[in-house]
């Protein structure tokens, strides 16, 4: 992960918001957009169990109200399907193809595998990515990389993730990436992570390797930049 994530910290892309954490930007944008209105009126449509969400996440009730109103503005039906999710996500990476990575990200948000993401799914993931512990963020990242959800990461899955990130970054990267760069990073990833050399990386191996490597821990911020 250090090789994979560390590499991205050196990539400079001409994106619309190159230095913004997208998850944080979304929250700030919706808060600034709606905060004045909330002073005058209460949110009319809320998900059931707002207090329960407050207990389950790291957001306050007011923050949840802001996020819910923003979510409803973007997704009036109260849920977002994969196609809509891809369209929204693509706006952050106009110079690349974000569709494949958005597909993997959508599956990580869709924890019940229903083909749609509810507000509860969205805000739970956002809470982890913005305010979760290091351990929580690592577990969430592992789940994202574990594409087929079988409990471990193999080389094919890691290769798919890395290629999807490179496609998303597009051709406006510096330094220019060579064709074999993704494979090289995946090989280094497995040299560090696959402790028992059995060709797969388990959650325990992933957590241990990440927390032992300062470079990996510093690069956690990079993941949030493409979240």
Curated annotation (Swiss-Prot):
Name of the protein described by the UniProt record: A-type potassium channel modulatory protein KCNIP1
Sample GO molecular function, one term: potassium channel regulator activity
Binding residues for Ca(2+) 2: 194, 196, 198, 205
Topological category with respect to the lipid bilayer: Peripheral membrane protein
Entry-linked InterPro entries: EF-hand-dom_pair, EF_Hand_1_Ca_BS, EF_hand_dom, Recoverin
Cellular compartments annotated: Cell membrane; Cytoplasm; Cell projection, Dendrite
Oligomeric form and interacting partners: Component of heteromultimeric potassium channels. Identified in potassium channel complexes containing KCND1, KCND2, KCND3, KCNIP1, KCNIP2, KCNIP3, KCNIP4, DPP6 and DPP10. Part of a heterooctamer composed of the tetrameric channel and four KCNIP1 chains. Probably part of a complex consisting of KCNIP1, KCNIP2 isoform 3 and KCND2. Self-associates to form homodimers and homotetramers. Interacts with KCNIP2 isoform 3 in a calcium-dependent manner.
Pfam families with a match to the protein in the record: EF-hand_7, EF-hand_8
Ligand binding (Ca(2+) 1): 146, 148, 150, 152, 157
Function, in words: Regulatory subunit of Kv4/D (Shal)-type voltage-gated rapidly inactivating A-type potassium channels. Regulates channel density, inactivation kinetics and rate of recovery from inactivation in a calcium-dependent and isoform-specific manner. Modulates KCND2/Kv4.2 currents. In vitro, modulates KCND1/Kv4.1 currents. Increases the presence of KCND2 at the cell surface.
Gene3D superfamilies hit by this protein: EF-hand
Tissues showing expression: Expressed in brain. Found in a subpopulation of neurons widely distributed and enriched in Purkinje cells of the cerebellum and in the reticular thalamic and medial habenular nuclei.
Domain spans labelled EF-hand: 38-94, 97-132, 133-168, 181-216
SMART domains: EFh
BP term (GO), one: regulation of potassium ion transmembrane transport
Region feature (Interaction with KCND2): 214-227
Domain of life from the UniProt record: Eukaryota
Keyword tags: Calcium, Cell membrane, Cell projection, Cytoplasm, Ion channel, Ion transport, Membrane, Metal-binding, Potassium, Potassium channel, Potassium transport, Repeat, Transport, Voltage-gated channel
Protein family: Belongs to the recoverin family.
């Amino acid at each position: 992960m250090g090789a994979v994530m560390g590499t991205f910290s050196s990539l400079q892309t001409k994106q619309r918001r190159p230095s913004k954490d997208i998850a944080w930007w979304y929250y700030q944008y919706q808060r600034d957009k709606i905060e004045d209105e909330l002073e005058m009126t209460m949110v009319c449509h809320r998900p059931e169990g707002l207090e329960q969400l407050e207990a389950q996440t790291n957001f306050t009730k007011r923050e949840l109200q802001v996020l819910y109103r923003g979510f409803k503005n973007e997704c009036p039906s109260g849920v977002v399907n994969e196609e809509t999710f891809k369209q929204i996500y693509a706006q952050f990476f106009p110079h690349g193809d974000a569709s494949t990575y958005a597909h993997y990200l959508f599956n990580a948000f869709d924890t019940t595998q229903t083909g749609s993401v509810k507000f509860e799914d969205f805000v739970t993931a956002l809470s982890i990515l913005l305010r979760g512990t290091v351990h929580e963020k690592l577990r969430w990242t592992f789940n994202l990389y574990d594409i087929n959800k079988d409990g471990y990461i193999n080389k094919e899955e890691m290769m798919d993730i890395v290629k999807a990130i490179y496609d998303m970054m597009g051709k406006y990267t510096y330094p220019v990436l060579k064709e074999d760069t993704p494979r090289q990073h995946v090989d280094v990833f497995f040299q560090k992570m696959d402790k028992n050399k059995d060709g797969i990386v388990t959650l325990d191996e992933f957590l241990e390797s990440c927390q032992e490597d300062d470079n990996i821990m510093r690069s956690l911020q990079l993941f949030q930049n493409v979240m």
